[in-house]
């Protein structure tokens, strides 16, 4: 593992030579993990944006055979790789310039009222959604009894869903649906009751898995998707989209028939799912990354990375997750910037280069205006009298 193969660790702080020595120590540590789980580490560079730690955790995850809940396999390995990378940095005393775990601890303060990322109470606002009667979402809404067929103002048949428990950030009270204001944190829930159930699930699940941790008032969550990892600023929301998903099939289950961890989801059949900051839900003309992980799987990923570290190193993993603090930089960026594709044609405007350029003669400077003198009547008589005197004097000579 030669340092000549390493990329410039732009997200890592420290003097050049000292940072290189620490990167070399980190590469040796990853080689140790790779040997334990049969991962080739010959070309590793320990760059923050390289998926090297993802490969190591992915190999470990395959042996565990974890069944995800609303999470993609790619996101599970990515988040596990981020945590392993941050732990390795802390082990070799290499200080990143940003939070490379991509995760944080949010002191949500939820009680009787739900609060947004500003720390203020969320506002309830009635919201109505119209969908085509033949669309997949419209048919699903009718089957679930969430919508009704109506004729809209354009005379079209639509499925109308009325969200009575829709809550939004206080800064979006005067904004239209799904169009957050410039001061918004971007947090909203279509069903406040389901969101509350998901938060109760998260609290009790954390208590069940990490029984010694005092986390009743904190939510462990990712804040970076693939779009803004590493402290990047993007258009739109700056924090992962937080959505409560229902856990189906819990009807008829008794808590005593399942494990204590599973019993949490029987009592509170909803779970938070974190997605791309600007997840579009399949909207045309918009793109989003495929980041998707549930809170339950996020806890399991942290647990598995800790177990993996303990198996290889023989002692607990060093890791630190910062507290979430609201900052104006996390507000929704609503700038409308012009887009366009790059055209590499040499002559896109059809200029004829064979034609000689006409010589441009600079215009001559304007001549100064002559000053017109004004002659009075007295001056005219004086000149005539002077002329007569001159003529008479010539005759005398």
From Swiss-Prot:
<dbReference type="GO" id="GO:0003677">
    <property type="term" value="F:DNA binding"/>
</dbReference>
<keyword id="KW-0244">Early protein</keyword>
<dbReference type="GO" id="GO:0006260">
    <property type="term" value="P:DNA replication"/>
</dbReference>
<feature type="region of interest" description="Flexible loop">
    <location>
        <begin position="129"/>
        <end position="161"/>
    </location>
</feature>
<feature type="region of interest" description="C-terminal arm, DBP binding">
    <location>
        <begin position="335"/>
        <end position="397"/>
    </location>
</feature>
<feature type="binding site">
    <location>
        <position position="276"/>
    </location>
    <ligand>
        <name>Zn(2+) 2</name>
    </ligand>
</feature>
<comment type="similarity">
    <text>Belongs to the adenoviridae E2A DNA-binding protein family.</text>
</comment>
<feature type="region of interest" description="Disordered">
    <location>
        <begin position="338"/>
        <end position="397"/>
    </location>
</feature>
<feature type="compositionally biased region" description="Acidic residues">
    <location>
        <begin position="342"/>
        <end position="360"/>
    </location>
</feature>
<dbReference type="Pfam" id="PF02236">
    <property type="entry name" value="Viral_DNA_bi"/>
</dbReference>
<feature type="binding site">
    <location>
        <position position="118"/>
    </location>
    <ligand>
        <name>Zn(2+) 1</name>
    </ligand>
</feature>
<keyword id="KW-0235">DNA replication</keyword>
<feature type="binding site">
    <location>
        <position position="185"/>
    </location>
    <ligand>
        <name>Zn(2+) 1</name>
    </ligand>
</feature>
<comment type="subunit">
    <text>Homomultimerizes on viral ssDNA bound to pTP. Forms a initiation complex with viral polymerase, pTP and hosts NFIA and POU2F1/OCT1. Interacts with host SRCAP.</text>
</comment>
<dbReference type="GO" id="GO:0008270">
    <property type="term" value="F:zinc ion binding"/>
</dbReference>
<keyword id="KW-1194">Viral DNA replication</keyword>
<dbReference type="Pfam" id="PF03728">
    <property type="entry name" value="Viral_DNA_Zn_bi"/>
</dbReference>
<feature type="binding site">
    <location>
        <position position="116"/>
    </location>
    <ligand>
        <name>Zn(2+) 1</name>
    </ligand>
</feature>
<keyword id="KW-0862">Zinc</keyword>
<dbReference type="InterPro" id="IPR037540">
    <property type="entry name" value="ADV_DNB2"/>
</dbReference>
<feature type="binding site">
    <location>
        <position position="169"/>
    </location>
    <ligand>
        <name>Zn(2+) 1</name>
    </ligand>
</feature>
<dbReference type="GO" id="GO:0006351">
    <property type="term" value="P:DNA-templated transcription"/>
</dbReference>
<dbReference type="InterPro" id="IPR036368">
    <property type="entry name" value="ADBP_zn-bd_sf"/>
</dbReference>
<feature type="binding site">
    <location>
        <position position="225"/>
    </location>
    <ligand>
        <name>Zn(2+) 2</name>
    </ligand>
</feature>
<dbReference type="InterPro" id="IPR036362">
    <property type="entry name" value="Adenovirus_DNA-bd_N_sf"/>
</dbReference>
<dbReference type="GO" id="GO:0039687">
    <property type="term" value="P:viral DNA strand displacement replication"/>
</dbReference>
<dbReference type="InterPro" id="IPR003176">
    <property type="entry name" value="Adenovirus_DNA-bd_a"/>
</dbReference>
<feature type="binding site">
    <location>
        <position position="227"/>
    </location>
    <ligand>
        <name>Zn(2+) 2</name>
    </ligand>
</feature>
<dbReference type="GO" id="GO:0045740">
    <property type="term" value="P:positive regulation of DNA replication"/>
</dbReference>
<dbReference type="InterPro" id="IPR036367">
    <property type="entry name" value="Ad_DBP_C_sf"/>
</dbReference>
<keyword id="KW-0945">Host-virus interaction</keyword>
<dbReference type="GO" id="GO:0019028">
    <property type="term" value="C:viral capsid"/>
</dbReference>
<protein>
    <recommendedName>
        <fullName>DNA-binding protein</fullName>
    </recommendedName>
</protein>
<dbReference type="InterPro" id="IPR005376">
    <property type="entry name" value="Adenovirus_DNA-bd_zn-bd"/>
</dbReference>
<feature type="binding site">
    <location>
        <position position="289"/>
    </location>
    <ligand>
        <name>Zn(2+) 2</name>
    </ligand>
</feature>
<keyword id="KW-0597">Phosphoprotein</keyword>
<keyword id="KW-1048">Host nucleus</keyword>
<keyword id="KW-0479">Metal-binding</keyword>
<comment type="function">
    <text>Plays a role in the elongation phase of viral strand displacement replication by unwinding the template in an ATP-independent fashion, employing its capacity to form multimers. Also enhances the rate of initiation. Released from template upon second strand synthesis. Assembles in complex with viral pTP, viral pol, host NFIA and host POU2F1/OCT1 on viral origin of replication. Covers the whole ssDNA genome during synthesis. The complementary strand synthesis induces its relese from DNA template. May inhibit cellular transcription mediated by the interaction between host SRCAP and CBP.</text>
</comment>
<dbReference type="GO" id="GO:0042025">
    <property type="term" value="C:host cell nucleus"/>
</dbReference>
<keyword id="KW-0238">DNA-binding</keyword>
């Amino acid at each position: 593992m030669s340092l000549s193969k390493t990329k410039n660790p732009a997200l890592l702080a420290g003097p050049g030579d000292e940072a290189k020595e620490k990167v070399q120590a980190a590469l040796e540590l990853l080689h140790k993990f790779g040997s334990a789980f049969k991962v080739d580490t010959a070309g590793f560079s320990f760059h923050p944006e390289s998926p090297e730690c993802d490969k190591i955790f992915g190999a470990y995850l395959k042996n565990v055979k974890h069944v995800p809940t609303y999470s993609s396999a790619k996101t599970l390995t990515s988040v596990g790789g981020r945590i392993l990378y941050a732990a390795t940095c802390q082990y070799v005393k290499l200080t990143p310039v940003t939070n490379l775990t991509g995760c944080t601890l949010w002191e949500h303060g939820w009680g009787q009222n739900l609060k947004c990322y500003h720390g203020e109470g969320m506002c309830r606002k009635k919201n109505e959604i119209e969908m085509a009667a033949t669309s997949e979402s419209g048919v699903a809404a009718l089957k679930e009894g969430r919508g009704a067929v109506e004729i809209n103002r354009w005379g079209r048949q639509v499925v109308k869903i009325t969200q009575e428990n829709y809550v939004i950030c206080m800064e979006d009270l005067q904004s239209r649906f799904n169009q957050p204001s410039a001061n918004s944190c971007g947090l909203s829930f279509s069903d406040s009751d389901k969101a509350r159930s998901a938060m109760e699930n998260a609290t009790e699940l954390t208590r069940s898995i990490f029984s010694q941790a005092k986390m009743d008032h904190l939510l462990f969550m990712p804040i970076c998707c693939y779009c803004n990892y590493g402290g990047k600023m993007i258009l739109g929301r700056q924090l992962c989209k937080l959505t409560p998903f229902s856990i189906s099939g819990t009807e008829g289950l008794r808590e005593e028939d399942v494990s204590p961890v599973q019993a949490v989801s029987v009592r509170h059949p909803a779970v938070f799912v974190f997605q791309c900051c600007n997840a579009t839900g399949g909207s045309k003309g918009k793109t989003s990354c495929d980041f998707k992980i549930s809170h339950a799987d996020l806890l399991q990923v942290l647990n598995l990375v800790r177990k993996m570290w303990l198996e290889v190193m023989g002692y607990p993993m060093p890791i630190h997750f910062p507290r979430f603090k609201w900052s104006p930089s996390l507000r929704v960026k609503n700038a409308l910037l012009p887009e366009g594709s790059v055209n590499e044609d040499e002559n896109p405007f059809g200029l004829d280069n064979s034609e000689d350029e006409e010589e441009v003669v600079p215009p001559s400077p304007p001549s100064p205006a002559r000053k017109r003198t004004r002659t009075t009547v007295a001056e005219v008589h004086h000149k005539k009298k002077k002329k007569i005197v001159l003529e008479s004097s010539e005759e005398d000579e």
